[in-house]
A protein has these predicted regions:
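Short glycine/serine- and small hydrophobic-enriched flexible loop segments
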Residues: 94-102, 169-176, 239, 284-289
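Bacterial N-terminal signal peptides that target proteins for export
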Residues: 1-10
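Membrane helical hairpin/interfacial module
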Residues: 84-91, 95-156
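Hydrophobic core segments within long, regular secondary-structure runs in both alpha-
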Residues: 53-65, 94, 112-123, 168, ...
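Low-complexity, Ser/Thr/Pro/Gly-enriched N-terminal "stalk/linker" regions
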Residues: 21, 29-85, 127-140, 240
Length: 305
């Protein structure tokens, strides 16, 4: 727990009064005690943004808040049709709620309730190898779930490593953000830890040390592994950091070696290439990669930022 000091507003009033002529005044109620976070860093100031940016931020938050099922916390893959929920969308929604708090668009209590509902759903939903009636297996979840029941949406829906990672990044973000002593915030942290610990990452290493894109109960493991620079960076990071089912460090080493065909040059500047913008954005939503280098990027004289 951080060191905290209590500063009485009454003491400040007395100090000011001592510098002024004494006057007879009627007794006043004692001001409330002010709690000061002594060693907490100052809150960063939100930069001034063009009105368009502010509008995009607000609308993005509102999409997740307004379209998510309040009963189970599931967020649709698309709108307005909302045929099914995406577990990746849920990860982004869990991240959006604190942004709403920080901007004053929802209260902390509202966001806590929504987040706790979501995490309880993923903790309690049926899991197993069966083709129907389940939301996931081995700690991983199906890419698309029925919006109401939260079960696998259809037979073409895979148990997805990267979408589970996107969900889990939101879960772990919630665990970090809700750091108060409120019993509900403590429960958020506990459930988040439980969900992360359940994921059996080595199970998807059918061609170790690389990690497969997923699994179907009908046909088994997907034949393709995560290779080349892309959004799967967070898959390997989560798998390496697992407190219960970690993959070995050579998973990262071998994965980065698959970058070799992904380099390009623009105006004399060498860069790590991946066409779709989301491949560069997704992992960076939650991890600040500035000045971080692994052995591979150090050899190239580059970074991920």
């Amino acid at each position: 727990m951080q060191a905290r000091h209590l500063l009485s507003a009454a003491a400040l009033s007395l100090a000011v009064a001592a510098c002024q002529p004494a006057q007879q005044e009627p007794a006043k109620p004692r001001p409330p005690v002010i709690l000061i976070e002594a060693d907490a860093p100052p809150r960063p100031m939100k930069p001034e943004l063009p009105p368009l940016f502010d509008d995009i931020e607000r609308r993005t938050f509102q999409f997740f808040w307004d379209t998510t099922n309040e009963i189970n916390g599931l967020t649709p893959d698309r709108y307005p049709s909302r045929p099914f929920a995406s577990i990746a969308s849920v990860g982004f929604a869990l991240t959006a709620y604190p942004i709403g708090i920080e901007n004053g668009w929802v209260s902390r209590n509202q966001a806590i309730d929504r987040t706790l509902t979501t995490l309880k759903f993923f903790r309690d939903v049926p899991m197993g190898p069966q083709r129907t009636g389940k939301a996931g297996y081995k700690g991983f979840y199906y890419h698309f779930l029925d919006m109401q029941e939260g079960r696998r949406y259809d037979s073409w829906v895979e148990l997805s490593s990267v979408d589970t990672a996107l969900l889990m990044m939101g879960v772990l973000f919630a665990q970090s953000y809700y750091d108060g002593d409120d019993p509900r915030e403590k429960e958020i942290r506990q459930i988040a830890d439980t969900l992360y610990r359940k994921i059996d990452w080595p199970w998807l290493q059918q061609r170790a040390p690389l990690i497969s894109m997923g699994w179907f109960p009908e046909s088994g493991f997907i034949d393709h592994d995560w290779m080349g620079y892309n959004e799967a960076m967070m898959v390997y990071i989560l798998a390496l950091g697992s407190p219960t089912h970690p993959v070995s460090p050579d998973a990262w080493t071998v994965w980065t070696r698959t970058y070799d065909n992904d380099w390009g040059v623009y105006q004399g500047q060498e860069y790590l290439s991946f066409g779709p913008l989301f491949g560069h954005q997704y992992s960076h939503v939650w991890i600040h990669f500035r000045d971080i280098q692994d052995a591979y990027m150090r050899e190239r004289g580059s970074t991920y930022f």
